[in-house]
Amino acid sequence: MTLKKVDANPSTLESSLQELKSDETSRSKINFILFLADNDPTTGQSWCPDCVRAEPVIYKTLEEFPEEVKLIRAYAGDRPTWRTPAHPWRVDSRFKLTGVPTLVRWDGDSVKGRLEDHQAHLPHLILPLLAPST
């Protein structure tokens, strides 16, 4: 039906999450965070081959869902930034990221499901994340 995308980075993700929380319509919608690597300015493509493979599959799967889906695309930074052990999303207890891409079903203030880098490109694993939360 409709896939609404919002872009964020380590300094803007919290405000994007607060907007989701305060938006009355978002509370009844399906919300995701897709943690990605930044695009390489010299090529225009992500420096992460798994992200390049997963992004189109994720977008297509979410766009085909009959209900509105909101997706925050959270860009982790360039390769050296992401590789830093103290990266904010690696140490944040809500996310505990170990790789990109990571697709997270976000409900309220918490993770309700996730697919790690080696799973995020598989539609048959994305679809169960779209099921109603309990």
Swiss-Prot record:
Q: Which SUPFAM superfamilies match?
A: Thioredoxin-like (SSF52833)
- A Pfam family of the record is TXD17-like_Trx
List the active site. C48 (nucleophile), C51 (nucleophile)
Thioredoxin domain ranges (all copies): 1-134
- Source organism, top-level taxon: Eukaryota
- Kindly state one GO CC term assigned in the UniProt record: cytosol
Q: Give each disulfide bond as a residue pair.
A: C48-C51
Task: Give the keywords, sorted.
Answer: Disulfide bond, Electron transport, Redox-active center, Transport
The chain's coiled-coil residues are: none
**InterPro entries membership:** Thioredoxin-like_sf, TXNDC17-like, TXNDC17_dom
Example GO molecular function: protein-disulfide reductase [NAD(P)H] activity
Regarding protein family, the annotation reads:
Belongs to the thioredoxin family.
Q: What does this protein do?
A: Probable thiol-disulfide oxidoreductase that may participate in various redox reactions.
Q: What is this protein called?
A: Thioredoxin-like protein Clot
Q: Give the source species.
A: Arabidopsis thaliana
